[in-house]
Regions:
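Class I S-adenosyl-L-methionine-dependent methyltransferase catalytic core
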Residues: 1-197
Length: 197
């Protein structure tokens, strides 16, 4: 399924594609090449890189658009491939989430592959020339882990502070968020879904 971000009469007539200046995505990465391949699949359906690349995200990106893409370090090559497939150019790491335990606020450590992992990164890529609205947004996010793979809510706030209150969508969303259109299999979508084929 892919986002159908069109507005109109709902019957196919007079419809235009909704364009977004911010796209925030936390893809359900499939770790087929890794020994922990079943870990994510225990919690939610995953997608192969080919399936992710086939999503028509470029169609919903405005002329000037910022993409914020969560990636894990083992999936970094796939994340960079996905950025390009969606029509964006990699710029930097926007946010580094340093994970804490929920109760004790000590550092949380996952299993990792070579070293015990703690951090997760959100990459920033652009299409066109989106403008930064604030120079005071910090890269570090120190926040407790929640349910599997759920990202800190404050990241959305940082994105809006950085880029402004512009049309925005969260792909693979896990919750409704005021001011954001959402699309994903864990939320009631604010956009219609269009099936391929």
């Amino acid at each position: 399924m892919i986002p159908d971000c069109r507005s109109g009469d709902g019957k196919g007539g007079g419809r235009t594609i909704q364009k977004y200046q911010i796209i925030y995505a936390d893809p359900p990465w499939d770790y087929q090449q890794c020994r922990l391949s079943g870990s994510a699949k225990k919690h939610y359906p995953t997608m192969r890189i080919e399936e992710l690349c086939a999503l028509p995200v470029a169609e919903i990106a405005d002329r000037d658009c910022a993409l914020f893409l969560w990636a894990t370090f083992p999936q970094l090559p796939e994340a960079l491939r996905l950025i390009q497939a969606w029509g964006f150019v990699y710029k930097t790491v926007a946010f580094v989430w340093l994970k804490q335990n929920r109760k004790a606020l000590t550092w949380f450590y996952g299993l990792g592959f070579w070293t015990r992992r703690n951090a997760e990164i959100c990459l920033l890529a652009t299409k066109g020339h989106p403008k930064r609205q604030s120079a005071g947004i910090h890269q570090l996010v120190i926040s407790p882990v929640e349910r599997h793979s759920k990202k800190p809510n404050e990241v959305r706030e940082k994105i809006v502070a950085l880029m402004g209150d512009v049309p925005r969508i969260e792909l693979f969303a896990r919750q409704q968020t005021p001011g954001w259109d959402v699309w994903g299999n864990e939320v009631e979508n604010s956009t219609a879904l269009l099936k391929e084929g």
